[in-house]
Amino acid sequence: MSKQNQWIVGVNAVASSVENDADNVREVLIEAGSKNPRLTEIEEQARRKGIDVRRVNTQALDGVGGQVRHQGVAARYAAARLWAENELEGLVEAAAGRALVLILDGVQDPHNLGACLRSAAAAGVTAVVIPKDKSATVNATVRKTSAGAADRIPVVAVTNLARCLRDLQKQGVWLYGLAGEAEASLYSVDLRGNVGLVLGGEADGLRRLTREHCDGLVKIPMPGEIESLNVSVATGVTLFEAVRQRLGA
């Protein structure tokens, strides 16, 4: 896994990092004078785990949070936890025929990526695959939006998405791409075995080459007047149809 230094902000994101990955939290900054009990809990847990904690003014937190609302807390974090492409094979093998892989083809808005990761973690996915280029990466905004989910699931960054899709197929992963013009409904296909769910970016959807590497295309039926969903909403709908089938509902 590759690592990089970054700041994460927000109560849920910092609390999750302190709880789940304390070894990679370098320090925690908390707004001086705050009486928020959640911040007190974070401070106490961080100190118990040997993490440096500093009380600072709001301006200092504004400086590390940028445009992201910090909620009075920030942490300097050492790991982006991006898994290498060659680690994906082992993750699929370990799923023993029930791998559920989410492939995001060029989701560029970090808020959308964070929301997708949150849904993916809730659905218990095996891994999330993103391209290294033309895609949001796991930055502070993504961590905050994901409410800590970015720390809980493998995010695999790949150089060549088409090659990655071929490799998944060689492992017996059946790839379904989500496309509004598809004839088959999401609710008509079997999502219980080794399955990869492929969703495109906000503007253009699935790229041509990505589409060509899918084993099938499906759509979410929309009887209303709106014919499209935000990618993070579509991700949640698609993942939890897979969950429903796998639970036998």
UniProtKB/Swiss-Prot annotation:
Binding site for S-adenosyl-L-methionine: G200, I220, L229
Disulfide bond annotation, renumbered to this chain: none
Compartments where located: Cytoplasm
Highest taxon of the lineage: Bacteria
Gene Ontology cellular component list: cytosol
InterPro entries cross-referenced by the UniProt entry: 23S_rRNA_MeTrfase_RlmB, Alpha/beta_knot_MTases, Ribosomal_eL30-like_sf, rRNA_MeTrfase_TrmH, SpoU_MeTrfase, SpoU_subst-bd, tRNA_m1G_MTases_N
This enzyme's EC code(s): 2.1.1.185
Pfam entry (one): SpoU_methylase
Main EC class the enzyme belongs to: transferase
SMART domains: SpoU_sub_bind
Family affiliation: Belongs to the class IV-like SAM-binding methyltransferase superfamily. RNA methyltransferase TrmH family. RlmB subfamily.
HAMAP family: 23SrRNA_methyltr_B (MF_01887)
Function text: Specifically methylates the ribose of guanosine 2251 in 23S rRNA.
Designated name of the protein: 23S rRNA (guanosine-2'-O-)-methyltransferase RlmB
Gene source species: Xanthomonas axonopodis pv. citri (strain 306)
